[in-house]
Amino acid sequence: MKKMFSVILFLSLFAINVFAQDIVLSGDITSNTTLTANNTYLLNGYVRVQAPAVLTIEAGTKIFGDKSSLGTLIIKPGAKIMAAGTEANPIIFTSVFAKSGSVSTPSYGDWGGIIILGNAKINPAGGTAAIEGPGDSFGGTDDEDNSGVMQYVRIEYPGIALTLNNEINGLTMGGVGRGTTIDHIQVSYSGDDSYEWFGGTVNCKYLIAFRGWDDDFDTDFGYSGKLQYLVALRDPDIADQSSSNGFESDNDGSGTLNEPITSPTWWNVTMIGPKKESGTTINSLYKRGMHLRRSSRNKISNTIIMGWPTGIRLDGANTIQAALNGTMYINNSIVAGYTSTAMDTVSAGGASFNMGDWWTASSGRTFTANTEVALTDPFNLTTPNFLPTSSSPALTGAATPPSDGFFDATANFVGAFGSVDWTAVWADFTPGNYVTSVEENQLSSTPVDFNLSQNYPNPFNPSTKIVYSVAQPSQVKLVVTNILGQVVETLVDEFRSAGTFEVNFNAENLSSGLYIYSLEAGSVSISKKMTLLK
């Protein structure tokens, strides 16, 4: 941790001001490295984690992406990312302009994004390919490949344009194997797709795509993983020049039948498009809730698609033939609030296909107005509530997910939500204004004992002072936890000489409530309560 120290002698007291500064990450990471929550980090250029290195990121860590250098994190095949955030303490990747006091406002494409590359199968000739954007190679033969863990991670304002029509997605997964853990991820304000899978077998749960620019969930190159509990919400004004869709799925760019076939299995998805009601003005580049094309074979169940000009498009003879023979399906799902057509087909070839009959036979339901689906407040762009009300048709007509060790077989409802809002606590629909420093002042060098004083003021909003004393040189840890015992902020985790210290704690990013702050120094452990009241 880089620090600035200034010493001011006044009578018998002196002060040392300590301000956290970003630790710059650049170039290759070639050995095991840990990013800690008591520091902040800046991605400068392409930061590549090379095999066999492991990048560990503590819960609550904030990593900022630099715009001018195209800051991007790339996990190479054979390397790992271990980013296990918690519900109370998610890991945040965001724009450098999202810092409190920044002279610029964070926006789409302020930095690159996160790219995870693995050794699972993909379908281009030769079984390897160069990832779009930086061009690193990925793909192999190991579908069980493990690229690490990403849990409770927010990715904000990614998707920078490298060149015209060449952007990085929010979270890109290329050839990532099913040994990898991906769940509780929120991608917000991506300048390209929120998520894109290029082949691989990785399974994913609890994904949020919020106010993206291009597509929400894009699958290519033979991706065949399992997914459950996904939600997307769009901004009516923002769409991509290439047209914006919810799902976009291709076997490959030419629609060949190269194997493995793009064939992900989706359960419990809610796709909220840009058009809340018939009078809502939307960007003309918005097209479809799902565009399934180029020989892809998606398997979709218990899904809501609402507020899109067209609900579903099946595109291409091979895709339609897959629908006819049952290797591609959309079962027990709802389309609502469409302005052009609920569903259509393109290029059926010689196949005789009636999409309306196919939809009805698959237990599909269609509603003219979004209000008929009776979700609580799904189009709210600052505090959305995707839960169905008691009268919602989403609570009936669902299929039962398989009990296979991955899918939650109790999700007997249509859409991503039943009675539990799994976005609560960790997700943020108004990201930014992050305070990135904790100020610590040494008040005295002659304490008589280890001590932790009551914070002042208390209750507080949003800042308070905490004074502690160290009787002898010690490793000191001062943390803030919630009432569940989960660490929400690490204020100090360093060696301290004997002295009395004052920490100025800014809790701007925490919600109101009771918190515990605890001091561990030497053999002493002291805890006290404080109340944040906003």
Where do the protein language model's features map onto the residues?
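Sec/Tat signal peptide C-region and signal peptidase I cleavage site
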Residues: I16-A20
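Extracellular beta-rich repeat passengers
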Residues: Q21-T56, D66-K80, G85-T86, P90-D192, ...
